[in-house]
From Swiss-Prot:
Propeptide: 22-51
BP terms from Gene Ontology: cell-cell adhesion
Secreted recorded as keyword: no
Family (UniProt): Belongs to the FimE family.
Subcellular location: Fimbrium; Cell outer membrane
Any one cellular-component term (Gene Ontology): cell outer membrane
Self-association and partners: Fimbriae are composed of a major, structural subunit and the minor components FimC, FimD and FimE. Identified in a complex composed of FimC, FimD and FimE (in vitro). Does not directly interact with host proteins, but only as a complex with FimC and FimD.
Organism: Porphyromonas gingivalis (strain ATCC 33277 / DSM 20709 / CIP 103683 / JCM 12257 / NCTC 11834 / 2561)
Signal peptide: 1-21
Disruption phenotype annotation: Triple mutants lacking FimC, FimD and FimE show strongly decreased interaction with host CXCR4 and impaired down-regulation of the TLR2-mediated innate immune response, resulting in strongly reduced survival of the bacteria.
GO molecular function: host cell extracellular matrix binding
Record's keyword terms, sorted: Cell outer membrane, Fimbrium, Lipoprotein, Membrane, Palmitate, Signal, Virulence
Lipidation feature positions (S-diacylglycerol cysteine): C22
Protein name: Major fimbrium tip subunit FimE
Length: 550
C-alpha cells in the first residue's frame, strides 16, 4: 500500500508538469482533461436581527476556492470561483470517478503546485490562519460520485473557523452596573481552516482542532472594549478547555463597569464560560456564546490584571447565564426579529414588529410555525397586555396605559417543534426620557425651556450640550437629534440640512452611544439679529426650547 501511494503521488506530480491549467492561473496544477464549468450556491447559515459591521464580518464571502481531491484524498487542483451574490461558478476537470471538494472561503492558497499529490489529511490540518481580515475564513467538504460538464454542485453550507461572543448586561436598575463594556481575553491567536480528527482521518463538525504553536492573541486595549448590550460582538478561535486549570489562562470575558453608582470608580470582573453545573465550555468554531448578566452583588477587582489573575466572578459576585449555541444564529433554522428592544413613550395603544423564520436548508420563510408568548418580570407592571401573530410575521402588541412609571414585558418569539430557537423582544411603556442635563451655552434648561443671551452679529457661537440618561438602552439606536433654526448654522460635522413643515432643521443621526453619553453641537449665528426660539427634538425625549436673546 505504501509503495502504491508513492507511485500515485509521483503520477500526480508528473501530471502537474504536463497538463495545462484548469483555471485562469496558467501555472495551476490539475489533472489531464479539458476543464468544465461547474456552479453552485452558498447557503447563508444565519440571518441577524441586528445588522452592521459584525454581520458583514460573519457572512461575507469575498473569495471562494475549490480544492479538488481524488477518491483517495490526494490533491489534484485548485479552482478560484467567480462569485455573484450567493451563487458561484468555477472551472474544474470533469471526472467519472469520485471527487472530494473542499470549499474554502476568504483564503488564498499561495502555491497549489507544492501540494499536488498530497493527502487532504495532511494538507487541511497543517494550514492555520490568524484573525487578520475583515472577514472570517469558512470551509465545507463534499464528496461527489463524479463531476460532469456543467454540473450544479448544489448548496454549500460553510462552517466558520471562529466562535462568536456577546455580553448583555441588564439595565442598572436591575444589574447595579453602569457604563458596562467588555472584551474577550485569553483567546488563541490562530486557528485551522477545517476541523479534523487525527484518530479517524475525518473532518467532523464539532471536532476541536487547535493548530501547532498557538499562543494567546494580543490583549484587547481598554479603548477597544465594546458596549455590553448584546449587540456588539467579539470573535475568537476554538480551544479545548476540558483539561486546563484556572492558572493556565482560561478563555474569558472581562467586564468593566461602575458598581451601584453612575459616578463610582470602574472595577473589573472575569467571566468564565460555564454551564449551570459550573462545567466549563469548550470554545468551538461556528458556535455563539451568549452571556447575560442580570445582577452584580459586589464591585469587581480594582484593575484589569487583578481580574484576569483572580477567580471568575460567575456565581460569586455576579448572577450570569451562559448559552453555548451551535451556530452564529442559535438553533436550527433562522429566526429573526427586526427589533430586540422597543420603547413606547407617546401613549400608543398598540405597536408592531416583524418576525421571520426560515427553516434549515430553505430560502423561503415559514410563518406558520411562529409562536408568541408574553411574560412580565417579577415586581414590574406589564407593558404588553396581549401579543398575537397577524400573519406574514407581523406581531401586533396591545400596550398597557402609559403612567408615570416604567412598565415592561418580554415578548418571546418561538418556533413550533424547535424549543431551542427563540428570540426575546423587550418592550417598555413609559413617559418620555429626560436629559440628565440640557444646556444652551452655560444656561441649563428647566421644565424643558432654556434662555441664553448671545451678542448680536454674525459668527457668534451657540453650544448645545446634553447628557443622555443611563437607562437609555443602546438597542434603541439609531436616534435622530433635530435642531430647528433659521438664524444659526452648524459647526459640528455630520449634521444634515433639511426642511420639515416649512422650517429649516439640522439633523444628526446617533448610531453609537457617545463617551459618557454626552452630546455637544456647536452652531454659529448667520444673521446680525439672531434672536429666535429654537426647537430641539430627539426620538423618545421631551422636546426642548432654546430662547435666544440678543
Amino acid at each position: 500500500m505504501k509503495s502504491k501511494s508513492i507511485i500515485a503521488q509521483l503520477l500526480y506530480v508528473l501530471i502537474a508538469f504536463m497538463a495545462v491549467s484548469c483555471v485562469a492561473d496558467k501555472s495551476e496544477p490539475c489533472p489531464s482533461g479539458e476543464p468544465t464549468r461547474v456552479s453552485g450556491s452558498i447557503v447563508s447559515l444565519e440571518h441577524h436581527g441586528l445588522r452592521g459591521a459584525s454581520a458583514d464580518k460573519e457572512n461575507s464571502v469575498e473569495r471562494l476556492e475549490l480544492w479538488v481531491f481524488d477518491e483517495d484524498g490526494h490533491f489534484l487542483e485548485r479552482a478560484v470561483a467567480d462569485l455573484s451574490g450567493s451563487t458561484f461558478t468555477a472551472k474544474i476537470i470533469p471526472s467519472e470517478v469520485e471527487r472530494r471538494i473542499h470549499f474554502i472561503a476568504n483564503y488564498e492558497l499561495a502555491d497549489p503546485s507544492v501540494w499536488v499529490g498530497r493527502s487532504e489529511r495532511e494538507m487541511l490540518p497543517s494550514i492555520s490562519v490568524a484573525d487578520d481580515l475583515e472577514t472570517i475564513r469558512m470551509w465545507a467538504r463534499i464528496s461527489y460520485p463524479s463531476i460532469a460538464p456543467n454540473q450544479n454542485l448544489g448548496q454549500i453550507q460553510l462552517l466558520r473557523n471562529m466562535a462568536k461572543f456577546s455580553l448583555s448586561v441588564t439595565p442598572p436598575a436591575e444589574s447595579k452596573l453602569y457604563d458596562a463594556s467588555y472584551a474577550l481575553y485569553n483567546s488563541w491567536n490562530k486557528g485551522t481552516l477545517a476541523p479534523f480528527d487525527p484518530n479517524t482521518g475525518s473532518f467532523p463538525q464539532g471536532q476541536i482542532t487547535e493548530p501547532a504553536g498557538v499562543v494567546f492573541a494580543n490583549p484587547t486595549s481598554e479603548a477597544a472594549f465594546k458596549e455590553a448590550d448584546g449587540a456588539h460582538f467579539f470573535y475568537g478561535f476554538e480551544r479545548d478547555q476540558s483539561n486546563i486549570g484556572t492558572g493556565a489562562g482560561i478563555t474569558c470575558l472581562i467586564l468593566k463597569a461602575r458598581y451601584n453608582l453612575p459616578n463610582a470608580d470602574y472595577t473589573y470582573y472575569k467571566l468564565d464560560f460555564v454551564d449551570t453545573n459550573k462545567v466549563r465550555y469548550n470554545i468551538t468554531r461556528n458556535h455563539f456564546y451568549k452571556m447575560i448578566l442580570k445582577k452584580a452583588k459586589a464591585p469587581g477587582r480594582p484593575t484589569l490584571q487583578e481580574a484576569l489573575d483572580g477567580a471568575a466572578a460567575n456565581n460569586i459576585f455576579l448572577s450570569a447565564e451562559v448559552q453555548a449555541l451551535p451556530a452564529f444564529s442559535d438553533g436550527s433554522g433562522m429566526l429573526t426579529v427586526d427589533h430586540t428592544y422597543m420603547v413606547f413613550v407617546q401613549g400608543e395603544p398598540s405597536g408592531t414588529f416583524q418576525a421571520t423564520y426560515i427553516p434549515q436548508g430553505q430560502n423561503n420563510p415559514d410563518y406558520s410555525k411562529l409562536t408568541v408568548s408574553v411574560s412580565t418580570p417579577t415586581g414590574q407592571q406589564a407593558a404588553v397586555t396581549s401579543a398575537q401573530h397577524e400573519g406574514n410575521g407581523k406581531i401586533k402588541l396591545t400596550l398597557a396605559q402609559q403612567e408615570n412609571l416604567t412598565k415592561r414585558s418580554d415578548v418571546v418569539i418561538g418556533v413550533q417543534g424547535n424549543p431551542d430557537l427563540k428570540r426575546s423582544v423587550t418592550v417598555l411603556v413609559r413617559e418620555k426620557y429626560q436629559y440628565v442635563f440640557f444646556k444652551a451655552n452655560t444656561s441649563s434648561a428647566e421644565n424643558n425651556q432654556v434662555t441664553t443671551q448671545i451678542s448680536a452679529g454674525q459668527g457668534n457661537e451657540l453650544l448645545i450640550s446634553a447628557k443622555l440618561p443611563d437607562v437609555l438602552n443602546a438597542a434603541l439606536l439609531p436616534i435622530t437629534f433635530k435642531v430647528y433654526t433659521e438664524h444659526f448654522y452648524p459647526k459640528t460635522g455630520g449634521m444634515i440640512l433639511g426642511i420639515e413643515g416649512g422650517k429649516t432643521l439640522y439633523k444628526y443621526v446617533l448610531t453609537t452611544m457617545p463617551q459618557n453619553k454626552e452630546l455637544q453641537f456647536r452652531f454659529k449665528s448667520n444673521k446680525v439679529n439672531s434672536a429666535e426660539n429654537i426647537a430641539v427634538k430627539m426620538d423618545y425625549f421631551h422636546d426642548q426650547t432654546i430662547h435666544v436673546t440678543n
